[in-house]
């Protein structure tokens, strides 16, 4: 056959690969992009566990952890909107840059259909009481607003993103 020529090949269609492709498109890179993923497109990912009530160790790969959007497609879809949780990103790139990056990623989820409601904000008095109890117990309470996508909604959002990438010339 005819050899295919790409400017950029993205290995893996998890969140990092997805956002890389979105950024290339939006920054006007004008590149021919191929995204390689060993799993299925989001709309073809099915887990037999819902029928069998047990994991059957699917071969060659698990449809829950592998495929477009990675394991996130079948989680409960919670996005932590604070750099206070989830790793060392603030130490690596600075707190303000980490917060701006989280807000930017969140704006993309909103654009593709995420609910605008954010959990964990607007209950300052209750949080203040819980914080006092945590301190007394030797704990540190971390405020972390959460955008809850929900499992079904997460799949809809990732499907919309997948279609956006395809419509913008990304080969998968």
Where are these regions (language model features)?
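Short, intrinsically disordered, charge-balanced linker/junction segments flanking boundaries
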Residues: 1-3, 168-172
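Structural motif
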Residues: 9, 32-34, 71, 171
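Generic N-terminal leader segments that precede the first folded domain
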Residues: 10, 15-18, 41, 49
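Conserved N-terminal/central alpha/beta ligand/cofactor-binding core
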Residues: 38-169
């Amino acid at each position: 056959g005819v050899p295919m020529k790409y400017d950029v090949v993205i290995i893996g269609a998890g969140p990092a690969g997805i956002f890389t492709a979105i950024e290339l498109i939006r920054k006007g890179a004008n590149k021919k992009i191929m995204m390689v993923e060993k799993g299925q497109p989001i709309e073809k990912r099915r887990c037999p566990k819902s029928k069998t009530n047990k994991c059957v160790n699917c071969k060659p790969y698990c449809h829950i952890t592998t495929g477009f959007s990675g394991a996130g497609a079948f989680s409960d879809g919670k996005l932590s909107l604070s750099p206070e949780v989830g790793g060392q990103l603030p130490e690596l790139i600075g707190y303000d840059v980490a917060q701006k990056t989280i807000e930017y990623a969140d704006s993309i989820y909103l654009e593709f259909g995420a609910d605008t409601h954010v959990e964990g904000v607007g209950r300052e008095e209750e949080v203040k009481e819980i914080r006092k109890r945590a301190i007394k117990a030797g704990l540190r309470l971390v405020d972390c607003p959460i955008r809850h996508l929900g499992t079904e909604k997460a799949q809809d959002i990732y499907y919309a993103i997948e279609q956006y990438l395809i419509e913008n010339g990304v080969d998968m």
